[in-house]
Amino acid sequence: MFASRPAVHPVEAPPPPDPAEQPRGVLMKDLPGMPGTAGGLGLRLAQFAFAAVALAVMASTNDFPSVTSFCFLVAAAILQCLWSFSLAIVDIYALLVKRCLRNRRAVCLFAIGDGITAALTFSAACASSGITVLIDNDLDLCSENHCASFESATAMAFLSWFALSPSFLLNFWSMASG
């Protein structure tokens, strides 16, 4: 057997420094777009605005409930509005009291929530764009439907997803590297 048996030699530790001089711990990098920053608040407000416009435009038509993908877009836009608005309020609070929101649990919660809402918003926008192309180009039924409203709502849903993607990627990267 060639197992090694290391000997442990005690090393005298230096005296602890003054508690006032100790670093407060390792903080994650303060990147624009992270929770609790002005960039993060801007992204949340853009997500909310685009999702609210998509919801308002789609709800203004009277025939959206007849197509399942449009109902899915409305449901995803409602969820996106609620999520983005609540996190925008949290960001405003963090900015006002100068509080750091980048602890591990908060970033994990933000990343998971952003991932779920991003997947729902993107899939709803893709499904709605497929139906819109079917109605407009393939069936030529735009004279009977609200194609411009459907296209506008779908475009706003994609813009909401584009505003959500940096938030998700920054939170996920921060969660994975922390």
Swiss-Prot record:
<feature type="topological domain" description="Cytoplasmic">
    <location>
        <begin position="1"/>
        <end position="37"/>
    </location>
</feature>
<protein>
    <recommendedName>
        <fullName>CASP-like protein 5A1</fullName>
    </recommendedName>
</protein>
<feature type="compositionally biased region" description="Low complexity">
    <location>
        <begin position="1"/>
        <end position="11"/>
    </location>
</feature>
<dbReference type="InterPro" id="IPR045009">
    <property type="entry name" value="CASPL-5"/>
</dbReference>
<feature type="region of interest" description="Disordered">
    <location>
        <begin position="1"/>
        <end position="25"/>
    </location>
</feature>
<dbReference type="GO" id="GO:0016020">
    <property type="term" value="C:membrane"/>
</dbReference>
<feature type="topological domain" description="Extracellular">
    <location>
        <begin position="127"/>
        <end position="152"/>
    </location>
</feature>
<dbReference type="Pfam" id="PF04535">
    <property type="entry name" value="CASP_dom"/>
</dbReference>
<keyword id="KW-0472">Membrane</keyword>
<feature type="transmembrane region" description="Helical">
    <location>
        <begin position="38"/>
        <end position="58"/>
    </location>
</feature>
<feature type="transmembrane region" description="Helical">
    <location>
        <begin position="153"/>
        <end position="173"/>
    </location>
</feature>
<feature type="topological domain" description="Cytoplasmic">
    <location>
        <begin position="91"/>
        <end position="105"/>
    </location>
</feature>
<keyword id="KW-1133">Transmembrane helix</keyword>
<feature type="topological domain" description="Extracellular">
    <location>
        <begin position="59"/>
        <end position="69"/>
    </location>
</feature>
<comment type="similarity">
    <text>Belongs to the Casparian strip membrane proteins (CASP) family.</text>
</comment>
<feature type="transmembrane region" description="Helical">
    <location>
        <begin position="70"/>
        <end position="90"/>
    </location>
</feature>
<keyword id="KW-0812">Transmembrane</keyword>
<feature type="topological domain" description="Cytoplasmic">
    <location>
        <begin position="174"/>
        <end position="178"/>
    </location>
</feature>
<dbReference type="GO" id="GO:0005886">
    <property type="term" value="C:plasma membrane"/>
</dbReference>
<dbReference type="InterPro" id="IPR006702">
    <property type="entry name" value="CASP_dom"/>
</dbReference>
<comment type="subunit">
    <text>Homodimer and heterodimers.</text>
</comment>
<keyword id="KW-1003">Cell membrane</keyword>
<feature type="transmembrane region" description="Helical">
    <location>
        <begin position="106"/>
        <end position="126"/>
    </location>
</feature>
